[in-house]
């Protein structure tokens, strides 16, 4: 798969469980006034819940269209990220907050507008970016760090998120820097997973393990994967505000063996499921593609491997911590099982059962099993 296909896959996934404390223990903070741009989608509710649990005062800014009534007791300012649409950002004028957490910014023009308007009224601007905003990923087994250059576009004025999601996030970061150069925090998550994720890119795995039987495991156990539980990310965002962390942070677990991830997921939800490892070359012959048919995996010998090989050392040193893979698997499956039956029958990612069975049958035939 080419980088452009990977970017398209990430963009396609754009879219409240208990929040046990996993972040490194810190003293109870002084209450802060926080503004969250968004707050009612996937990452937002987890961030709001954790901020409230920490004693902070939260104000939401959104269009009032997603999950209405989710936080009825919170002040919600209705507006639009686009300053040219209806009242735009006018509801934020003249207000002051200790920090803003921007988890709904995708277009540099709009992010620049909010950062410029709030520059004199917030102490810190935390922007949720993406690990794919880098110019390119590292190849050859070296873990990429925050010093890698950002992506560039031939046409920086484009607002085509479906084609240039990653690059536009890089320009969003630049827009925040231009407005608030010394008080900006860029949190760069990889694949965000867990309860409320509507993309199913991760969810496919616990759901598939729970179904049982023979499960196609792509590649080799030693290939790498990376992700972050949405609740761990939410806690880190609030932690960055409480601690005043400025700068860029890769927010992913450090690369872990693909085999241990699949085994942990299986053991958490259905230890009787059987993993059958099928090499990358055979999968390619049968049109099984990473980040298309199977998510969270790339062959260690392919150029795509660098997409799952980023260093999180800086964020970990700043306080980012991770819950066990088994907990993420169990909680995600429990949430998924609360969805309507028709939705549960229509996974939005991963191989359908017929294709998986056909590839496994072909593999066994080749191996003489």
Q: Where is each model-derived feature located?
A:
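N-terminal export signals
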Residues: 4-25
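N-terminal Rossmann NAD(P)H-binding glycine-rich loop of SDR-like oxidoreductase domains
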Residues: 37-54
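N-terminal Rossmann-fold cofactor-binding loop
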Residues: 61-65
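Conserved Rossmann-fold cofactor-binding substructure of NAD(P)-dependent oxidoreductases
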Residues: 78-96
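NAD(P)-cofactor binding segment of oxidoreductase domains
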Residues: 97-151, 171-173
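Conserved beta-loop-beta element that borders a ligand/cofactor-binding pocket
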Residues: 129, 172-196
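Substrate-positioning beta->alpha
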Residues: 200-205, 218-243, 247, 327
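Mid/C-terminal beta-alpha module of Rossmann-like enzyme folds, strongest
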Residues: 236-313, 330-333, 340-368
């Amino acid at each position: 798969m080419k980088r452009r296909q990977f970017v398209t896959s990430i963009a396609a996934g754009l879219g409240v469980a208990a929040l046990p404390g996993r972040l490194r223990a810190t003293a109870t903070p002084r209450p802060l006034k926080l503004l969250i741009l968004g707050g009612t989608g996937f990452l937002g509710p987890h961030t709001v819940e954790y901020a409230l649990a920490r004693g902070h005062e939260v104000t939401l800014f959104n269009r009032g269209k997603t999950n209405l009534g989710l936080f009825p007791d919170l002040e919600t300012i209705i507006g639009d990220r686009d300053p040219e649409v209806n009242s735009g950002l006018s509801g934020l004028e003249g207000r002051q907050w200790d920090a803003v957490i921007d988890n709904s910014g995708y277009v540099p023009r709009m992010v620049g507008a909010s950062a410029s308007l709030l520059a004199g009224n917030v102490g810190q601007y935390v922007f949720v970016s993406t690990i794919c905003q880098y110019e390119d990923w590292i190849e050859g087994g070296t873990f990429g760090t925050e010093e890698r250059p950002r992506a560039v576009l031939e046409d920086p004025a484009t607002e085509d998120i479906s084609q240039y999601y990653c690059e536009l996030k890089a320009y969003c970061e630049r827009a925040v820097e231009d407005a608030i150069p010394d008080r900006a925090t860029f949190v760069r998550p990889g694949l965000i997973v867990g309860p409320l994720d509507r993309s199913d890119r991760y969810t496919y795995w616990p759901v598939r393990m729970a179904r049982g039987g023979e499960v196609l495991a792509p590649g080799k156990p030693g290939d790498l994967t990376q992700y972050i539980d949405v609740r761990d990310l939410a806690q880190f965002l609030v932690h960055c505000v409480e601690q005043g962390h400025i700068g860029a942070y890769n927010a992913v677990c450090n690369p872990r063996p693909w085999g241990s991830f699949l085994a942990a997921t299986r053991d958490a939800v259905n230890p009787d499921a059987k993993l059958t490892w099928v090499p990358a070359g055979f999968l390619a012959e049968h049109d099984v593609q990473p980040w298309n048919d199977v998510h969270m995996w790339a062959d260690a010998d392919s150029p795509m491997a660098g997409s799952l090989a980023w260093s999180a050392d800086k964020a970990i040193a700043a306080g980012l911590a991770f819950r066990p893979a088994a907990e993420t698997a169990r909680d995600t499956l429990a949430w998924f099982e609360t969805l309507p039956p028709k939705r549960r029958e229509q996974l939005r990612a991963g191989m359908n059962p017929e294709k998986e069975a056909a590839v496994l049958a072909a593999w066994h035939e080749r191996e003489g099993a």
